[in-house]
Design a protein with these regions (language model features):
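Catalytic P-loop NTPase motifs of RecA-like helicase/translocase cores
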Residues: 1-2, 201
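Alpha-helical substrate-recognition element adjacent to the catalytic core
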Residues: 2-151, 242
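C-terminal cap/substrate-recognition subdomain and adjoining C-terminal extension
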Residues: 118-138, 145-261
Length: 261
């Protein structure tokens, strides 16, 4: 879905500035938020993980934002990074940082639901690719986003018709979800994960499955290539190797390790 930029620029980032009272540094903090969550090698990480990285950077380089340790402890022990998991954890630890984190996440989710439909649509070529792939493959959505938003977006555009299952943040990590499907009997060489972030790549590699990258700012081109060449290459058993590595290198090169530019 072509929603990530709009969600971060208009929902997650502004809600972050508001929740932590960072109006004095608004422009710098919003740029920082976008660089970390959209354009860095952390692109695609869960909202709570992105929040912690951003808070830690702000705390060290811009202005104090309070004790971050309770948030770090939760992220270290939780199996699922979701509002529901955080609420359960807060039954034993309702530290101020966790209260603010939950309020920020809920506010961001509310803002996402108010986004214009024009800003929550698929990239060109996605439906055609899914339609073609569904003739030969079981398609499963594995997302780190909020479950309500994921389901609503995929159903609105009829994309869920092509899928066998839609999983979101409360199903567990992407790596965990892939592992569950492998336990159902899918051969690793016959599983292709499609993603646009290094967390997607890491999840695929850790589970030993193949990976097809969607490179930022070249999304339409990547979806077209998947439909017209890479998918057939995968189905024929020719995708792994130099060709896949070349595409992955292109995606990695498009992401920065600098949080402020």
């Amino acid at each position: 879905m072509n929603t990530m930029e709009a969600k971060h620029q208009k929902c997650f980032g502004p809600a972050f500035v508001e929740e932590w009272g960072l109006e004095l540094y608004r422009h710098r903090v919003l740029d920082l938020w976008n660089n970390i969550n959209l354009y860095s090698d952390l692109r695609g990480i869960n909202r709570f993980q992105g929040l912690y990285v951003t808070l830690a950077y702000v705390n060290a380089n811009i202005t104090p934002v309070g004790d971050l340790e309770p948030l770090k402890r939760w992220l270290d022990v939780t199996e699922k990074c979701s509002n529901a998991a955080l609420i359960r954890y807060m039954e034993d630890d309702d530290s101020p940082i966790l209260q603010k984190t939950l309020h920020w996440s809920q506010k961001a989710s509310e803002l996402i639901l108010t986004m214009p439909i024009s800003e929550r649509c698929p990239f060109a070529g996605v439906e055609e690719t899914l339609s073609y792939a569904s003739e030969f493959c079981d398609i499963v959505v594995v997302s780190s986003a909020n479950s309500d938003a994921v389901s609503e977006e995929w159903e609105r555009y009829g994309l869920s018709y092509y899928t066998s299952l839609v999983l979101s943040q409360n199903a567990g990590s992407k790596e965990y979800c892939i592992g569950q499907f492998l336990e159902m009997g899918y051969e690793k060489s016959k599983v292709l994960m499609v993603g646009d972030g290094l967390d997607d790549l890491e999840a695929a590699r850790n589970q030993g499955v193949l990976f097809y990258p969607i490179t930022i700012r070249r999304e339409t081109e990547c979806w077209d290539r998947l439909q017209n060449f890479a998918l057939d290459s995968f189905l024929d058993g020719r995708y792994a190797g130099d060709y896949a590595n070349k595409l992955i290198y292109e995606m990695e090169s498009a992401l920065s390790s600098d949080y402020e530019t």
